[in-house]
Each structure stands twice: as C-alpha cells, then as structure tokens.
C-alpha cells in the first residue's frame, strides 16, 4: 500500500531595492517582500512500508516543488522589473514635478498634480490587486489539484483496505477449512483404530493394550484473530481524520487571506502537526505490520501442525498395518500347526483302532481254537474269557466316535456260570 504525502512549503522570494511603491506604501532599501500560501491539509494516512516508493515519491515532490519555486521566482522577477520600471517612471515624474514646482505654480499645474496623484494611486491599487489575484489564482489552482490528488489517494486507500480485508477473510476461511480437514482425518483414523482393535481384541489382548497406550488425542486450539474489529477501528480513525482535514480545508478556504507573518507562524504549526501525524502513522503501520506477522506466524504454525499430524498418522497407520500383517502370519502359523497336530492325532487314532481290531480278531481266533481243542474240564474250572468287540461310527464334522465293548464269560465244566459286558467310549 503506497501513500504519498504531498506537502507544499511556504515559498518566499526576497527582493532588495533602493526604493519601490507597493499598495500605496513606499518601501526603502533592505525591505523584504515575500509571497506565501497556506499548505493544503495533509493526507490522513501515510504508508512507509515501501521505502523505495517513498523515496521516489519524495524526490518527485521535491522536484515539483523546486520547479514551482523557480516558476514563482521568475514570475516575481517579472513583478520586480515592473516595479522598477514604475519606480523609474515615478522618479521621472517626480523630477518633472519638481521642475514644475520650481516654476511659478498655476491652476493648471494643480489640476495636473491632483490628477497625477489620483492616477498613481489607482495604478498602485491595480498593480497590487493584479498581483494578489494572480497569486490567489495560482494558489487555488494548486489547491484544487492537491484536493483531487488527495481524493484519488483516499479512494485508492479505501480500495486497498477492502482488498486487504477480503484477503484476511480468505486466509481465515482457509485456516478453518484446514482445521476441519484435520479433524475429519483424525476422526477417520480413530474409527479405523477402533475397528481394528474390535476385530483383534479377543485374539490379541496384549496388542490391544499397547494400542490403547499408543492412542493419541490431538487437540488443536487455533486463535482466531479478530481482524474485523481492528479494521473497523482503523477505518473509523481514518474517516475521522479525513473529515477533520476536510473541515479544516473548508474553513481555510472560507477564511480571508492572512498577512505574511501570521502565515509563517501557521505554517510552522502545521509542520509540527504533520510530524506528529507522521509519527502516529508510523505507529499504526508498526501495529499493522505486527498483526500481519502474527497472522503469518499463525498460518505457519497451522501448516507445521498439519504436517506433523500427517506424519504421525502415517507412522501409526504403518505400525498398525505391520501389526495386522504380523498377527495374520501368527494366526496362519497357528492354524497350520493345529492342522498338523490334528493330522498326527488322527493318524495315531487310526493306528490304535487298527491295533484294537487286530487284538479283537486274535482273541476271537484264540477262543475258537480253544473251543475246538479238547481239554480236561478241571483245567477250565477257573477260566475267564474276555471278549472284546469294537463298534465304530462316523460322526459328522470330521469327528470319529468309537465304542469298545468288553465281554467277560466265566465257564465251569463246560457251562457258562457268569457273563458280564463293559462298554468303553472314545471320541476322536
């Protein structure tokens, strides 16, 4: 934002002559004649953010003032020439008048003398009025240009302030959107963590505890800068200063043209006020610069926090993926080992079943052979025969149910005196 202070210092030119008459007054040697004008009110705001632009504007202002000063000096030199010419004519007329006075006065000479005095007085008045009107015209033209420039500067400043406000609002909206995006990412990651934890909470309880310890709650507290109030306050101050300056300008234009000594004192007071306003504007500029730096720091902090959150969530997601892959590998290895143990157990049961069948077959064969062989009855008096029968059934879902029946027969003298049956169940 560039604002230029256009100041017009009091312009003076000094003339020293032997004698001249201005406005009916005779000025002696060493008399100082100065022309001055009131400076226009200063702009309400100055921006020193761009030193280069300020220096160039200051140089242009100084150059324009120097050119105006030279033009005024040239114009005043022409006025001096006219005054000298009039002085010479005055001297000539005075010499002629002295010559006429040396002669015998007549009525015609008195008439000429009175008319001459009247003409001189009118000439002095016209000359003074002409010079005053020309100076006033130049001052009014320059003041009009200054007011137009000031109006343009005020319009540019207002547009720039509105653009800055829109930019600040856009930055605030972007920061809010970034914060909401981060919150949504955090919620999605937390839901994914809860889902993974719920799936594996029964099988891997120890991993669930580790995940619970590693859970990170992120809370972000973003300070929302109150830009609207600050800009409203600045605009209020700006409008107040602009209104005050406009009021002072109107009062100055309605007031009469003051004499040169009062103008010098007034210019000194205005210069002091200008310096004071420049200091105020410097302080305002520093405050706005601090606010801008604060907003930039807040933006950088938000971006840094966003990057840290993304990196941390990426690391956590990678660790969760690795843990999930490791658990899947462990589960697969456990399933493989369980299947291998089941297969070994099934093989052992099959071997045991085959052995039991062979034992039962041998016993039946042995009992048949014993029944065919003739043996004295006394030898079988205490004989106990144990008969074992095997009943196998297939059960659904891959389980094998086996019933083993042990039958005991007690015979004496070829007669069965006692018989018992015992059943054993085995499931595999």
From Swiss-Prot:
GO cellular component: cell projection; cytoplasm; intermediate filament
Region (Coil 2A) location: 227-248
Head, as annotated region: 1-68
Annotated region (Tail), positions in chain: 374-428
Region (Coil 1A): 69-100
Region (Linker 2): 249-252
Lineage: Eukaryota, Metazoa, Chordata, Craniata, Vertebrata
A single GO molecular function term of this UniProt record: structural constituent of cytoskeleton
Organism, scientific name: Bos taurus (Bovine)
Cell location: Cytoplasm
Region (Linker 1): 101-111
Chain segments carrying region Coil 1B: 112-210
PTM section of the record: Phosphorylated by PKN1.
SUPFAM superfamilies, per database record: Intermediate filament protein, coiled coil region
Modified residues (Citrulline): 26, 32, 266, 402, 412
Protein name as annotated: Glial fibrillary acidic protein
Function: GFAP, a class-III intermediate filament, is a cell-specific marker that, during the development of the central nervous system, distinguishes astrocytes from other glial cells.
InterPro entries: IF_conserved, IF_rod_dom, Intermed_filament_DNA-bd, Intermediate_filament
Record family assignment: Belongs to the intermediate filament family.
Modified residues (Omega-N-methylarginine): 12
């Amino acid at each position: 934002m560039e604002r230029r202070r256009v100041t017009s210092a009091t312009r003076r030119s000094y003339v020293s002559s032997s004698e001249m008459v201005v406005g009916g007054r005779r000025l002696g040697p060493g008399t100082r004649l100065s022309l001055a004008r009131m400076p226009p009110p200063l702009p309400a705001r100055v921006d020193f953010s761009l030193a280069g632009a300020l220096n160039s504007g200051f140089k242009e202002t100084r150059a324009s003032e120097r050119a105006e000063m030279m033009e005024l000096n040239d114009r005043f030199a022409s006025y001096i020439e006219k005054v000298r010419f009039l002085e010479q004519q005055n001297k000539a007329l005075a010499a002629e008048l002295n010559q006429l006075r040396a002669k015998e006065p007549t009525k015609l000479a008195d008439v000429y003398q009175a008319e001459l005095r009247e003409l001189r007085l009118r000439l002095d008045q016209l000359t003074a009025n002409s010079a005053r009107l020309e100076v006033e015209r130049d001052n009014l033209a320059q003041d009009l240009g200054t007011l137009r420039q000031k109006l343009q500067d005020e319009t540019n400043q207002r547009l720039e302030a509105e653009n800055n406000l829109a930019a600040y609002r856009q930055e605030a909206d972007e920061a809010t959107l970034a914060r909401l995006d981060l919150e949504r990412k955090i919620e999605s990651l937390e839901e994914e963590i809860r889902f993974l934890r719920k799936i594996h909470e029964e099988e891997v309880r120890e991993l669930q505890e580790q995940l619970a310890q590693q859970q990170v709650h992120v809370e972000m507290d973003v300070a929302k800068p109150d830009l609207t109030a600050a800009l409203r306050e600045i605009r209020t101050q700006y409008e107040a200063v602009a209104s005050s300056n406009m009021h002072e300008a109107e009062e100055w234009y309605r007031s009469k043209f003051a004499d040169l000594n009062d103008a010098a004192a007034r210019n000194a007071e205005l210069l002091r006020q200008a310096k004071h306003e420049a200091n105020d504007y410097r302080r305002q500029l520093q405050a706005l610069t601090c606010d801008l730096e604060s907003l930039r720091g807040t933006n950088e902090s938000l971006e840094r926090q966003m990057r840290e959150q993304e990196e941390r969530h990426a690391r956590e997601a990678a660790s969760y993926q690795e843990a999930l892959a490791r658990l899947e590998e462990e589960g697969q290895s456990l399933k493989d080992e369980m299947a291998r143990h089941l297969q070994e157990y099934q093989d052992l049961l099959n071997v045991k079943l085959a052995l039991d069948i062979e034992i039962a077959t041998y016993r039946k064969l042995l009992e048949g052979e014993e029944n065919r062989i003739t043996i004295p009855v006394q030898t079988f008096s205490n004989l106990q025969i144990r008969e074992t029968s095997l009943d196998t059934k297939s059960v659904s879902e891959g389980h094998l149910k086996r019933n083993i029946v042990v039958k005991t027969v007690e015979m004496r003298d070829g007669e069965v005196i006692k018989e018992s049956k015992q059943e054993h169940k085995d499931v595999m």
